[in-house]
C-alpha cells in the first residue's frame, strides 16, 4: 500500500506544470502543503506545518515545512527542493513529459541509446520531468 501511495504522489507531482523560476512553482508548493495538511498528524498539530515565504523572491515562492514531534530529544530533518527540469529537453515528447504513463507509451516508438532502451523495457524506472 505504501509503495502505491508513493507512486501516486510522484505521478501527481510530475503532472504539475511548474517550470523553474516562474510563479508556476507555487502550484507544487500548494500541493505539498495540502499533502501535509491532509495527514492525520498535521490535522492534530496544524501549527507544525506551513509555508515560509522566501525573502525578496520575485516569484513569491515559499519553502514548505512540516515538523513531527516525537519522544526523543534527537531531531531528524529532511530537506529538499521542488524545482523541475524544463520539459523542452523532451523534444518531440514535450507535450507528454508531465504524464508518466503517456510518456512511457510514446517512448516505445522513439530511438533511444542501449542503456535507456534497457531501462525502459525493465519497467523499473519512472519517466517524466
Positions of predicted regions on the chain:
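N-terminal capping segment at the start of a domain
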Residues: 1-26, 30
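Long, contiguous hydrophobic alpha-helical segments, chiefly transmembrane helices and signal peptides
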Residues: 10, 28-32, 77-85
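Generic hydrophobic, helix-prone segments enriched in Leu/Val/Ile
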Residues: 13, 25, 49-51, 84, ...
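A non-catalytic alpha/beta surface segment that caps or lines the substrate-entry region
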Residues: 19-73, 89-100, 125
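Active-site metal-coordination/substrate-binding segment of hydrolases
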Residues: 74-129
